[in-house]
């Protein structure tokens, strides 16, 4: 058995550690990135933490350009993995999927392939490119598992669990995400700044009463009491799982909400207003061409540097309302992750941890034959039970909280 992991950023760091802790099932591990030194640094951390469960299995680093399909195919054929885990940014999904198809090797990723905030991109079309591989993967005899992070990912499994065990009829699904931790910086992003800044400035899309609704970013807000984290303001955002849930789970409204503090939004609004969040090329007075967003990324702290000293909890979950046995029911299925616990385990913070742990939990379902049908699947389509039985042993527990049924108070902001 063997896996090939592509990507050595924050999520890749956690994925590699968790793969190493479970290499008795996953087998040999190869970590590949454009910068092989980043892979080697992860391997050093794994060895430092004694996280390689079976020392007889390989743990190696390789260099690869994830945009180059031919190079990817060559690496896959060299490594001969049973599964390729894509821990890279969303824009490499399609090249890696194509390489897996050509090499006839199964595939897993943690986010949708498109930037949901780019001009003209809309949530209703978010998965079109990747869903186009359904028949190809089935004919090739391989498995594709899409969006196996936390959100998307675990929140979709929570929704599937609610459908299977807790409800007869679903009215609303609200994905709730807040980071109540403190990294001690005035402003920083918890994962790749480019991805993060693009994600939170785009219009929000949500599903309501049989149609898609589109509103400006940060224009819909509600306050929610998060278990162990207290009350936080959360804002409606475009997000991957809204599309996949709408495809596979009948509900009257489906929406994603993320928490932002007032200070964070103040910094964000200033940077957006002066053009620092633009990905478009800009020519300076000396002829140098730069992208403002790339300049900002270079100025901000590396997300991997935030882990030491990061304190506090995250809370991410799926709030489902509907009916069971003819009675109204409201439940919040959630996880709390602790930044300090994550650092002690894998030398990283809880944001990356909550993405990396589910990816390996899903990979284990594939290797154990629980999630190994041929074709391309989103997490809502797969049996939630074996995944949720496994996830606590990999590092993330989960809970079901009963709430008082009732429609959330959504504030419409200017």
UniProtKB/Swiss-Prot annotation:
Keywords, alphabetical: NADP, Oxidoreductase, Polyamine biosynthesis
SUPFAM superfamilies, per the entry: NAD(P)-binding Rossmann-fold domains
GO terms, biological process: polyamine biosynthetic process
InterPro entries per the UniProt record, alphabetical: CANSDH, NAD(P)-bd_dom_sf, Sacchrp_dh-like_C, Sacchrp_dh_NADP-bd
Keyword NADP: yes
Functional pH dependence: Optimum pH is 7.25-7.5.
GO MF entry, a single one: carboxynorspermidine dehydrogenase activity
Means of activity regulation: Activated by dithiothreitol and inhibited by SH-reactive compounds.
EC number: 1.5.1.43
A UniProt-annotated Pfam family: Sacchrp_dh_C
Catalytic activity, as annotated: carboxynorspermidine + NADP(+) + H2O = L-aspartate 4-semialdehyde + propane-1,3-diamine + NADPH + H(+); carboxyspermidine + NADP(+) + H2O = L-aspartate 4-semialdehyde + putrescine + NADPH + H(+)
Keyword flag Transcription regulation: no
Physiological role: Involved in norspermidine biosynthesis. Catalyzes the synthesis of carboxynorspermidine from L-aspartate 4-semialdehyde and 1,3-diaminopropane. Is also slightly active with putrescine as a substrate.
Protein name per its UniProtKB record: Carboxynorspermidine synthase
Species, as recorded: Vibrio alginolyticus (strain ATCC 17749 / DSM 2171 / NBRC 15630 / NCIMB 1903 / NCTC 12160 / XII-53)
């Amino acid at each position: 058995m063997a896996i090939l992991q592509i990507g050595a950023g924050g999520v890749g760091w956690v994925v590699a550690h968790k793969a190493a802790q479970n290499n008795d099932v996953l087998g040999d591990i190869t970590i590949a990135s454009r910068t092989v030194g980043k892979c080697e640094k992860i391997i050093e951390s794994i060895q430092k933490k004694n996280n390689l469960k079976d020392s007889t299995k390989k743990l190696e680093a390789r260099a690869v350009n994830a945009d180059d399909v031919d190079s990817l195919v060559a690496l896959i054929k060299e490594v001969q993995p049973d599964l390729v885990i894509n821990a890279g940014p969303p824009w490499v999904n399609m090249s890696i999927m194509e390489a897996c198809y050509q090499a006839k090797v199964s595939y897993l990723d943690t986010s949708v392939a498109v930037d949901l905030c780019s001009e003209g991109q809309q949530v209703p079309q978010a998965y079109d490119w990747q869903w186009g591989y359904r028949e190809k993967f089935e004919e090739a005899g391989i498995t594709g598992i899409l969006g196996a992070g936390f959100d998307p990912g675990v929140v979709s499994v929570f929704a599937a669990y609610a459908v299977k065990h807790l409800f007869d009829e679903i009215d609303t699904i609200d994905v709730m995400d807040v980071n109540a931790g403190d990294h001690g910086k005035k402003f920083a992003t918890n994962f790749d700044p480019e991805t993060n800044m693009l994600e939170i400035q785009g219009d929000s899309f949500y599903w309501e009463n049989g149609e898609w609704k589109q509103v400006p970013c940060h224009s819909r807000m509600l306050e929610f009491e998060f278990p162990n984290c207290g009350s936080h303001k959360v804002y409606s955002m475009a997000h991957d799982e809204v599309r996949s849930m709408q495809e596979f789970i009948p509900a009257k409204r489906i929406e994603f909400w993320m928490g932002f503090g007032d200070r964070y939004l103040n910094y964000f609004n200033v940077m957006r207003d002066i053009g620092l969040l633009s990905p478009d090329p800009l020519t300076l007075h000396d002829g140098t061409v730069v992208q403002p967003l790339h300049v900002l990324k270079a100025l901000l702290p590396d997300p991997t540097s935030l882990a030491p000293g990061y304190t506090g909890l995250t809370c991410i979950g799926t709030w489902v309302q509907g009916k069971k046995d003819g009675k109204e029911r409201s439940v919040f299925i959630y996880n709390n992750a602790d930044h300090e616990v994550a650092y002690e385990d894998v030398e990283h913070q809880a944001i990356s941890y909550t993405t990396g742990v589910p990816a390996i939990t899903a990979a284990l379902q594939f290797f154990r034959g629980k999630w190994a049908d041929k074709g391309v699947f989103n997490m809502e389509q797969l049996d939630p039970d074996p995944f949720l039985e496994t996830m606590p042993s990999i590092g993330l527990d989960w809970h079901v909280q009963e709430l008082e049924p009732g429609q959330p108070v959504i504030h419409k902001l200017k």
